[in-house]
Amino acid sequence: VPTTKASFYARLGVLSPDEIITKLRGVNTPTGGFIEGADVHGFELIPTIMADAYPSGPATRDVFDAILEELLEGIRNAGDIDGVLLELHGSMVIENLDDGEGYILSAVRDLIGPNTPVVAQLDIHSNVSHQMVEMADVLIGRESYPEVDMAPRGRECADVLVRIIREGLRPTMALHQIPMMWGMNQVTAHSPMKEAIEELHRIESLPGVVCGSIATCFPLADVPDLGASVYIVTEN
């Protein structure tokens, strides 16, 4: 069953820039965390588009291209920006395109150039590719399933972006893909994910480590980058 334009409207729909701030302020979503971060740090958010669909088959190329162009047009119209915050999933598949997020990040990078930082928030069920890591400055994944930490992870993205812009943080990101598929229901309050997240937090406490994430993978996507992974961001 392909993901079509109707698939997006069946869930949360496609929100306009004006609707994004008003409808998602104070809501436990990554963008809700972006908004909180903007309020706390005192920077201006310029929303572009939000499009959210239930997981299904590959998205049709015309729908994907239309959504991506609206995102890019919003960035163009924003003028002289200091950075980009993106709420992505991490396992989007398009007709004849296996790495939707890698393509999105590449398109954003081509538009804004190499010196404007891009920080993106990902689902814990991500198939993280090397292209995604190469095109973003920082990727931060959610750490809970059920996913109750969406706003905190969005806030963390905003915090890291502020560190890059105002404090000169120079993030370096590394990805290790694990040849393993974990089931969709790896509850992080139970073993073995509980211990894996605890070890992740231990690594994050080490000097020079900015943040780290574990992706359990999205096992229903038949793509080359299918699989669990760990990605870590350090200072320079």
Give the location of each predicted region.
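Active-site histidine-anchored catalytic micro-motif
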Residues: 57, 61-68, 72-166
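Hard-cation-handling environments
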Residues: 184-236
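Internal, active-site/partner-interface "lid" segment
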Residues: 165-194
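Gly-rich Lys/Arg/Thr-decorated short loops/hinges at beta-loop-alpha junctions or inter-strand turns
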Residues: 14-16, 47-58, 87-89
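Low-complexity, highly charged intrinsically disordered N-terminal segments
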Residues: 31, 35-55, 63, 67-75
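Active-site catalytic microenvironments in core metabolic enzymes, especially phosphate/sugar-handling
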Residues: 1, 29, 147-150, 175-183, ...
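Structural signal for hydrophobic packing residues in well-ordered secondary-structure cores
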Residues: 38, 42, 75-79, 112, ...
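N-terminal amphipathic/basic leader segments beginning at the initiator methionine
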Residues: 1-40
